Amino acid sequence: MKTFDDLKFTHHKDIQRWTASLELDNGYLFSVIAGDKEDDWSLPYGTYQNETFEVAVFGTQFDDNGDRKKVPLSLHDDVLGWQKPIDISKLMRQFQLDGKAHEDLLIAMREEKKKEFNLHKIKN
């Protein structure tokens, strides 16, 4: 089972970010980033020194441009911010165990929330 510890971070000094990505055996791709400085709010939702990270998950489906579709990780955003390593490991475990079923649940929850605000007719 893959975990946060399997991520290999690269520091990008020019943009003040740490980045890592990891594809699970079932095809889901995790993208994890963090900023250098705690006080720079233009950076990702997380700072490397504090061991908090922003995570996105890309599914196994592709859009018309050939890009992987993001999995909606919350009702209002495609990313989760300020995640600790254990949180990311838990999310990885969830996708490794439930994969498409978990993705379908998250998509259904997002669609239901959009209907509450009459946004369901707007394309992502």
Predicted regions and their residues:
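Short helix-onset patch at the extreme N-terminus, typifying the N->h transition
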Residues: 6-8
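Amphipathic, interaction-prone secondary-structure segments
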Residues: 10-53
